[in-house]
A protein has these predicted regions:
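Mid-chain, well-packed structural core segment of small domains
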Residues: 66-87
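Conserved short beta-strand elements that form part of the metal-binding/catalytic scaffold
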Residues: 30-68, 109-112, 116-123
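Vicinal oxygen chelate
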Residues: 1-10, 36, 84-128
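Core segments of cupin and vicinal oxygen chelate
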Residues: 2-6, 12-54, 89
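Generic anion/oxyanion-binding catalytic loop in active/binding sites
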Residues: 10, 62, 69-72, 103
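Short secondary-structure boundary micro-motifs
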Residues: 25, 57-60, 82-83, 90-94
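Short linear motifs in intrinsically disordered
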Residues: 29-32, 74-76, 96-99
Length: 128
């Protein structure tokens, strides 16, 4: 595979009060928050619109399972289906099955510390 990760897709973290945290970041750091957190838009080297998501989540979310970590990183990738096969061949733990939505494909792995990592093959144009 030529490329694996092409950029940071998002940072997700647990907090006791996501709305309070979003309001604090909006007031003091100027983040333009919505129900999901904050989306940062940027352009890749080819000039395509891309996004990175910042999302505080409820402390009791099960989305990070099987990891017990209070955060989860999301990486933008190319050719997720092939990448998941290659990672499995390399002995990496793949969590669950790949899921496809109108805004991209998602897959999950665990790093050596047991942190769940989300891999996203985005369709940014669907988010514009």
């Amino acid at each position: 595979m030529k490329k694996r990760v092409t950029g940071l897709g998002g940072f997700f973290f647990k907090t006791k009060d996501p709305d309070k945290i979003k309001a604090w970041y909006a007031k003091h750091l100027g983040l333009n928050t919505d129900s999901y957190g904050c989306t940062f838009w940027w352009k890749d080297n080819e000039g395509k619109d891309c996004s990175t998501q910042w999302s505080p989540m409820k402390v009791d979310t099960t989305y990070f399972k099987p990891s017990s970590s209070p955060f989860m990183m999301n990486f933008r990738v190319e050719n997720l289906e092939e990448l998941l096969k290659v990672l499995a061949q390399e002995g990496i733990t793949v969590v669950g099955e790949m899921e496809t939505y109108d805004y991209g494909k998602f897959g999950w792995i665990l790093d050596p510390d047991g942190n769940k990592i989300e891999l996203w093959e985005p369709l940014d144009e669907s988010l514009l």
